[in-house]
Amino acid sequence: MTSRRWFHPNITGVEAENLLLTRGVDGSFLARPSKSNPGDFTLSVRRNGAVTHIKIQNTGDYYDLYGGEKFATLAELVQYYMEHHGQLKEKNGDVIELKYPLNCADPTSERWFHGHLSGKEAEKLLTEKGKHGSFLVRESQSHPGDFVLSVRTGDDKGESNDGKSKVTHVMIRCQELKYDVGGGERFDSLTDLVEHYKKNPMVETLGTVLQLKQPLNTTRINAAEIESRVRELSKLAETTDKVKQGFWEEFETLQQQECKLLYSRKEGQRQENKNKNRYKNILPFDHTRVVLHDGDPNEPVSDYINANIIMPEFETKCNNSKPKKSYIATQGCLQNTVNDFWRMVFQENSRVIVMTTKEVERGKSKCVKYWPDEYALKEYGVMRVRNVKESAAHDYTLRELKLSKVGQGNTERTVWQYHFRTWPDHGVPSDPGGVLDFLEEVHHKQESIMDAGPVVVHCSAGIGRTGTFIVIDILIDIIREKGVDCDIDVPKTIQMVRSQRSGMVQTEAQYRFIYMAVQHYIETLQRRIEEEQKSKRKGHEYTNIKYSLADQTSGDQSPLPPCTPTPPCAEMREDSARVYENVGLMQQQKSFR
């Protein structure tokens, strides 16, 4: 497991329920310290719109669920039950699934806070990307709830006087919502502490001065807190001219990584294929290019089209889920590539096409019209396309097309083209709402079609707007799957798609627009969740135990783990004598064991 941010060190059972119900989805979970048994912990899981609480015992030798498997650390216990679906069950056999960690809110929106990062990972980051005086703050792994200040103290080669890489780690204690380094002044926030020691450097016992010169910033963010990150990125960056914002700084750092993605593009460079490229230097990587299989065997270049498969690379914990959505990023059609375009759509069983450009912009051809007029039928080489109907929405036109092979009527399938018409000739849209509504329609259409192939996305070059739409869609899919408290990383996602097609997301404006679109999506989603919870929970007593008390005590084996239902919120109290902690006590509730 790469993160332990599901641990919430300072919340009660009531607060855990509120978090899971307002910010989580079914399958979301968190862990927290037990209030009734100090030293123990509680696992709180959202299931069927309610919350189950499971007691975790810490014996001093191991962690367990009062029986069953034993683990050396809390993280190993949680990881085990996340990975081994079906091991966590109620008495009646109902499975309790740990799918989506509900991450603890970061204590600061400062970009030098890296959240869950091990000491070794911090040293590697500071050695590879930092210089003398670079620093970051991270969560303590050995003392949950505390933090660590990691500072590079070697020279700019990463070496101290003895020739070794030197990174110093300073424990930051958090007690009674105050922060200190084990003595001296106490601060109200991590930011106040860091700012103090930037001006007043600490000195190690051996005399080394810990100078906090420049932060080593992270790009990871809890999606629910994107508003704070956008606010931070909108501030002036720490540059000499003081006119560049954090967005520029982050995008420039991303641009400097392009040298790591110099994959071969030999097929696009072949003389026979040059006239199939709209721009001579914007070519598909060989390792991800779409290879056309139905060409003339006597014409070796008939397998070429300027297009790449884009596969999102993010972890999923869902069982029995549909295959992850994939994309084809391609250029706008040329007159001599329209036939190949339809061959590709048919071969890949693509049912949705997203067009993000007008045919002509500022007097220049961006994409030839590759579809027939409404109600018309047209043949494109071996492919036949019939335009069944067109309908206009506020920002886009939807075309229902029928695609088949000439002479093979039984191969006909429906293809939906979503033509976004309101992207401005210069820059990006002022309001991301239109793009989000558009992508929502595209998502629902793709989801409604059984076994649909990749979504085809194109603009003119197939990298700028195309990359922007794809990255936004990938990030929103992650949030849909994992909930608003998942971690997202915009630069990392762009780097991932750039590893499959060169140059995806072209400008700082497009980069900023991605953040704005995700922020708008999160704000809208949170408002909807809050309104749903208000209407569902007002005066409603909920429980996740749907069977009688007799059912609870029947059976040959003790459950793994026993769990307690959530009681009415008005009756919140704790009973330390109970083995399984809950935020309330149901009348005459008996132990499951």
UniProtKB/Swiss-Prot annotation:
Give the matching PANTHER family: TYROSINE-PROTEIN PHOSPHATASE NON-RECEPTOR TYPE 11
Domain (Tyrosine-protein phosphatase): residue spans on this chain: 247-517
* Protein name in the entry: Tyrosine-protein phosphatase non-receptor type 11
Q: Outcome of mutating residue 309 to V, per the record?
A: In NS1; benign
Sum up the protein's function in the record's words: Acts downstream of various receptor and cytoplasmic protein tyrosine kinases to participate in the signal transduction from the cell surface to the nucleus. Positively regulates MAPK signal transduction pathway. Dephosphorylates GAB1, ARHGAP35 and EGFR. Dephosphorylates ROCK2 at 'Tyr-722' resulting in stimulation of its RhoA binding activity. Dephosphorylates CDC73. Dephosphorylates SOX9 on tyrosine residues, leading to inactivate SOX9 and promote ossification. Dephosphorylates tyrosine-phosphorylated NEDD9/CAS-L.
Q: What is the effect of changing residue 73 to I?
A: In NS1; also in Noonan patients manifesting juvenile myelomonocytic leukemia
Outcome, altering residue 61 to V:
In JMML; also in myelodysplastic syndrome
